[in-house]
A protein has these predicted regions:
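Short loop/turn segments at strand-loop or loop-helix junctions that form parts
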Residues: 31-32, 80-83, 98-109, 175-184, ...
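Donor nucleotide-activated moiety binding/catalytic core segment of transferases
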Residues: 59-65, 215-263, 283
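Conserved catalytic-core segment of nucleotide-activated headgroup transferases in glycan assembly
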Residues: 172-213, 217
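Catalytic binding pocket for nucleotide-activated donors in carbohydrate/polymer assembly enzymes
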Residues: 256-294
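Nucleotide-sugar donor-binding/catalytic module of glycosyltransferases
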Residues: 295-516
Length: 527
């Protein structure tokens, strides 16, 4: 006898194909993950390919499982949720062989929860996620590739949910549907609030749309018809096509988008948010179109001073235009460039959000103050002409600003290694700096990187703006006058690439000096 362990309706559908492919006998276990009615429905569907089943929905399951399997020899354990502690309390590697199967989009989207932090302990006897992956003797998959397991371990199985009696409607009717999904950490209250806000905005943008809630995660939405179904979407799609000739499917990066995109009569679209830039990039490779969905609606003016940066300014501008946040104006202040900087910048003026001003050379502080005088928004963001923002930069930081009305300034982390910025946003709730600790450290180090900072215009004006006498560390000098014990935050999350242009040796030396100055006293920099 073999055990197959499932935690979602999708896993049940894949497990059914595994049972067909192996032709072996199974004892099915379904772990209830929410109060959605489909949890019990799909647990019952396991009876169709398992000799016996157990639905885990209370703390009494241990004794029931021992009783049901008392005289049964378990040979193999089939698992999709690789890090599930309940599963690992049952699986015993001493006498069970482990096989695995797909757990949704983690098979094709990386990084994911199975490719990150593989050294974490996920079960008894200090078994780590990495060991679980290595223990798998074969991974059953409905996809052509896999992000977790090597090609040698992949066992391809079919996946077809179309009913035998299916007939597509020919009535010309069209319907829009949205597939719900939790973004970020589904047990984090802050992330659930972000998911609810983004989902609500997506539904409002779509207008007349049917909402299909996720079977494992509850997301509260308002003023929309939530469809009550007893099927997961991979099966429900055929019921829709029986009533509508064409179905427009929208979502974030749900597995369902991959699995229904090639069905005749179905068109698939996804929303790019600050949390899903990497996932959406992968979806594009599969031919799935995307549209940006900003979390914040706050207006922000971006000030970019530039001087002789014809080789880097285009990338800096492109990184601004590629933000998931869209309500911005980019104010480029050209400080009298003598190279082709102006020509490069003017190519972007067809975008009405881009403004270009060329002034006589007067230094970076003067250029910044000119930019501030042109700004009309409540918030001002700083961008350097040789740095690049990641797509999530504005949305992520503006959301943090709006959550705390005491903040006048916020910044984040940068890196000179672009590889560390790949794979989407990697948020950290640890080692953020704020309050008196940040205020104290600013007396000894410039804690903010200029190209990550967003501040209130009113606070900068009150502090007197940038002082032209301190070009080279004009930012630090401003923070010293502006930051108090409760109005600033430095978030320990990478949002920008810190450029060091090789073609300008003097500029390279200068920027390196500034980077090193992060650990010096102000007096040392003044020397």
């Amino acid at each position: 006898m073999n055990i197959v362990f499932c935690t979602s309706p999708f896993q049940v559908l894949v497990a059914r194909e595994v049972a067909k492919a192996t032709g072996e006998k199974f004892f099915g276990i379904y772990l209830k993950m929410s109060n959605d009615n489909r949890q019990k429905i799909y647990a019952d569907k396991m009876k169709g390919f398992c000799e016996d089943t157990l639905f885990i929905d209370d703390i009494e399951w241990h004794s029931e499982l021992r009783e049901r399997l008392a005289n049964v020899k378990i040979d193999k354990f089939y698992l999709a949720s690789l890090d599930n502690p309940i599963a690992h309390s049952i699986f015993n590697p001493s006498f069970m062989r482990l096989f695995t199967f797909d757990d949704g989009s983690t098979s094709i989207i990386a990084p994911n929860m199975y490719t990150r932090y593989t050294d974490r302990v996920v079960g008894p006897n200090e078994i780590t996620l990495e060991k679980v992956i290595n223990l798998s003797q074969g991974h059953y998959t409905i996809f052509d590739t896999n992000t977790v397991f090597s090609t040698e371990k992949l066992i391809k199985i079919p996946f077809d949910t179309k009913p035998n009696n299916f007939a597509r409607a020919t009535n010309g009717k069209r319907v829009k549907v949205f597939i719900g999904q939790a973004l970020g950490n589904y047990i984090d209250k802050k992330d659930i609030k972000i998911t609810e806000k983004l989902t609500q905005k997506a539904l409002e943008r779509l207008g007349d749309v049917l909402y299909y809630a996720h079977p494992r995660v509850s997301v509260n939405v308002e003023n929309v018809e939530t469809v009550q179904v007893d099927k997961c979407f991979e099966e429900e799609i055929y019921d829709l096509l029986s009533n509508y000739e064409n179905v427009e499917v929208y979502g974030f990066y749900s597995t369902s988008l991959f699995l229904v995109k090639d069905i005749p009569g179905v068109s698939v679209h996804c929303f790019r948010t600050f949390l899903t830039t990497n996932e959406v990039e992968i979806l594009r490779n599969y031919g799935i179109e995307s549209m940006d969905l900003p979390l914040s609606d706050a207006e922000v003016d971006i000030i970019m001073p530039v001087y002789n940066r014809e080789k880097t300014v285009a990338n800096a501008i492109e990184s601004v235009l590629n933000q998931t946040h869209k309500n911005f104006r980019l104010i480029i202040v050209d400080d009298g460039s003598l190279d082709g900087t102006e020509e490069v910048c003017r190519k972007y003026l067809n975008d009405e959000r881009v403004v270009y001003h060329k002034v006589l050379h007067g230094g970076i502080s003067r250029a910044l103050n000119i930019g501030i005088s042109l700004a009309t928004a409540k918030y001002i963001a700083r961008q350097e002409s040789d740095d690049e923002w990641m797509p999530w930069h504005l949305d992520f930081l503006l959301n943090e600003l709006e959550l705390n009305d005491k903040l006048d300034i916020i910044g984040s982390k940068v890196d000179t290694d672009k590889d560390k910025l790949q794979g989407g946003i990697k948020r950290s709730n640890f080692n953020n700096l704020s309050g008196e600790e940040l205020w104290f450290q600013l007396a000894y180090k410039n804690m903010f990187n200029h190209s990550t900072v967003i501040y209130r215009k009113s606070a900068v004006m009150e502090a007197g703006g940038y002082d032209p006498e301190y070009d080279g560390f004009e930012d630090w000098h401003l923070w010293a006058r502006m930051v108090t014990k409760d109005n600033a935050m430095l978030v320990n999350t990478l949002t920008a690439y810190y450029g060091l242009p090789e073609e300008d040796n003097r500029g390279m030396i200068f920027r390196r000096r500034l980077a090193k100055s992060r650990g010096l006293r102000l007096e040392d920099v003044l020397e």
